[in-house]
Swiss-Prot record:
Pfam families: SHMT. It is found in: Cytoplasm. Homodimer. Its main location: cytoplasm. Catalyzes the reversible interconversion of serine and glycine with tetrahydrofolate (THF) serving as the one-carbon carrier. This reaction serves as the major source of one-carbon groups required for the biosynthesis of purines, thymidylate, methionine, and other important biomolecules. Also exhibits THF-independent aldolase activity toward beta-hydroxyamino acids, producing glycine and aldehydes, via a retro-aldol mechanism. This is Serine hydroxymethyltransferase. It comes from Zymomonas mobilis subsp. mobilis (strain ATCC 31821 / ZM4 / CP4). Pathway: One-carbon metabolism; tetrahydrofolate interconversion; Amino-acid biosynthesis; glycine biosynthesis; glycine from L-serine: step 1/1. It comes from the Bacteria. It catalyses: (6R)-5,10-methylene-5,6,7,8-tetrahydrofolate + glycine + H2O = (6S)-5,6,7,8-tetrahydrofolate + L-serine. The modification N6-(pyridoxal phosphate)lysine is found at K235.
Amino acid sequence: MTKETASFFTDRLAAADPDVLTAINHELNRQRKQIELIASENIVSRAVLEAQGSVFTNKYAEGYPGKRYYQGCAPSDEIETLAIERAKKLFGSEFVNVQPHSGAQANGAVLLAVAKPGDTIMGLSLDAGGHLTHGAKAAMSGKWFNAVQYAVHPETQLIDYDQVRDLALKNKPRVIIAGGSAYPRHIDFAFFRKVADEVGATFMVDMAHFAGLVAGGVHPSPVPHAHITTTTTHKTLRGPRGGMILTDDPALAKKINSAVFPGMQGGPLMHVIAAKAVAFGEALQPSFKEYAKAVVENAQALAARLKERGSDLVTGGTDTHLALVDLRPLGVTGRDADCALERAGITCNKNGIPFDPLPPVKTSGIRLGSPAATTRGFRKAEFLQVADMIADVLDALSSKGEQGDPAVETAVRQRVEALCDRFPLYPEL
């Protein structure tokens, strides 16, 4: 073995590429010192990190367990089968595909499996809390399909179920989609299934945001109602970034497998599937139920305190891991709010609210989520403190204008760092 070959297999990142290590350490320090409230983000275990950084990253494994196109796939079959079986047990589903690289890939594969370009699909509109992949004009789902969007009621800001049925009867969609990225309440899956059956549609639920809450038993499961359920494997499920598709229908399972590979993707990411298996194993433990319960309780505590401090909440609160704050009464935009909060050490995202008069780059709201800080160890007492910090920053924006108040932001940042120091992340990294 040459010296160059030996160093290729032995040099750590610090020696091989210090510039990349520096950037990674910057991100590690950011995560350690900031409070993460982006609802779609979470913090994985050291075990998930280890699996995702494993030698499975070297392996191509096109196909499915027992039916690969390459040799040398026995360990890949082992890890993918483990991930599948754990997911089936976790969600009570007969068939699971763990290969989608993302939630968007999973949703795209479902549409490829059950619809043709030009078919009508129905989903919750983006400004009402839906997702790009549910028929938004800018996305593939809105360009390749005749996308009909249902909305929320202007007074309650809850899904307008009467409108859902009326639109379905009028448009006879091929696919009806429930789920979203900024809808803070439970969804009546049984109603959607009844409507889908009435018009002969395939009913798909995208549970990407609340899958971990379903796994933890604190959120109604869509799996018994949906023909097909999709999800990401991160967010509340607390695994690596990736996607997954579930169904109880063997005919649909066959179509889905073909749509994922070779329809949408080539080789699966076996190192990510290994990490998915780890995360599913973690979610099967009793402690995960306690985690999921805390996620909801913390989000509700955060929302309630913000309401006490004068914020308006879309739908008045939350049943899930996220809350949507309407900033219009404060005269503050989402863009100004998320920038000011980041300066203060709290990360969230600007977000449109139902019937938002502002464009997506500005918005009238912010979205706040509890999963990451709950993973860190925050409980109700800490979330009440966080809510007060957020309210202080928002009040300063309201009174001082879009630049905010540097003194308030500095004081909040000091409180944030003190709180973060009590709940350290990855101490051995």
